């Protein structure tokens, strides 16, 4: 079952956007643009409609969830019986191909983690053909291809890709999900740590232009960042919502988000 809408956080590269649940699952992502078909659509259905979860294998408690400073870089921490782990989620500013980057950091102890990648194209209707190619995982469906580059090996099961791994204090594991037209050669994945630094710098530099210094400045800046994240970069148009088909009121007709 999808989470409550208030439990989702937005990440964006100003050409597309994803919703990340408090449980570590990306349940909504239209790739490569806001108006493209979704490759993760569990938000509107079930997990089988597509999601990508990176979280402690045995559960745990989400103890902290925040954006890093004045950015759209999301940071989530879990406390488990084995220790504490942090997951950083963001979408780098677009270079040639769109990316979703997830970085797992060990804070203390040694925490068993799991990545479950269940790609479903066309809003959950199409199960892609998945194979390992050139050290990456490739999921292809018609004209679309999504590639996963990671330092953690994945294996297939039940039409999904899984990775079980352990992260110790001070260690990092990285995941880069990239869209590309299926007729092109595989994309060159971004360097996750460099992309993190550049993404934080982009958002914080932009937010620093806000001259408002009155009450609730943090809330004002966060609202501006959210609007910027929903602004389609090539035209400056603001999308009505990052999602679709969520009712303004349950049972009512206002379902355009």
Q: What spans do the regions from the language model cover?
A:
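Acidic, mature catalytic/reactive cores of soluble proteins
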Residues: 1-257
